[in-house]
Amino acid sequence: SNVLGKRTTTKDEELLSNLLNSKTVLACYNTTDPKITLAQSKDFDSYKLYLADTGLFTTMLFNDKSEVYSDIYIKLMGDKLDANLGYLYENLIAQELAAAGHDLYYHTWQKPNSTHYYEIDFLLSQKTKLVPIEVKSSSVQYHDSITEFAKKYSDRTGEQYLLSQKDV
């Protein structure tokens, strides 16, 4: 799989299946051709995994030394932690979307004349429109992916959400 950066084996697929069935992780699949029915172009080989319990994830991240844990947690809750926590915020949004009953999808596509890609962190389907969601850990000044997505799929894009640490 793309997650591991190598070809998957039957054992890898079995382990992933066990994790998903245990409900300890959430899978977010790439949709290669986003339409209202996102599942139609679901790429089973391209996915991101999120921990289903963000509180547990936070504890695992910052519980290196018990004496500094409370200080880190206070800084985290007060938005004063000097760290790039994009993965933590993204995990929180994944957990909330899944709890609301949404299947998790994201979308990537190559930037023109580049080896880099645009990525929409989460993509929902609501009625006849797609709803892109971008999660930023710091500056919301740069949001090329959501802007380009809205241009590329203007006929099917509805509301767009750009979430930052100030929103979470």
Feature roles, as predicted:
Residues S1-N18:
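Conserved helicase/translocase motor-coupling segment
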